[in-house]
Amino acid sequence: MDRIDALRAQLTTAADPARAPAMRAYMRGQFDFLGVAAPARRKAAGPWIQSQDAAGADGWLELANALWRQPEREFKYVSVDLQARHAAELPAAALPRLLVTAKSWWDTVDGLAAWVIGGLVRGRRELQTEMDTLAGDGGFWLRRVAILHQLYWKRETDAGRLFRYCSANAADPEFFIRKAIGWALREYAYTDAEAVRGFVASAALSPLSRREALKRIQ
């Protein structure tokens, strides 16, 4: 039994197939599920993820991509968790841009943005120029990644970059961009509420972005 088959056996045991239709419906019918709730998935996959610690960067990336190719969505969540565990150890060339654009939806994109790409860039600040490129990309999922990659950096956040990305994308009518702008600003407001208030007051944000940004500080 190879490693992916071993994980599949564990997830299948943890699955409640009766949950799968509702999980699929929540994702607008786009993806198949085994029916494993998030807590059960983490419990089932956690030991498997830990058992891959010795695989090294090449091994982790090979596994991450193999997981992404599995048809059920839960495997992509495990892929995100595996990469997030080792984000600080991955090489700069591992920036998982291709995974962002494969079977994209908010559930995988946000995990990649905040925990994988964010973790990778946090340890290798030279990669922020790549985020600058993504912030102006034609694909809105990649722009969402750029906006959200500093989501949990707190005082390490490059506020100038955050505000610049938000301004550059503020006029985009795409819901997932407007929501990302508000979310990123709201999270940074826990660190510097006055800076966020000042930016929101001067920027031409959509009502959705503005409302989300100020939700916790008004």
Which residue stretches match the model-derived regions?
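Alpha-helical scaffold domains
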Residues: 1-218
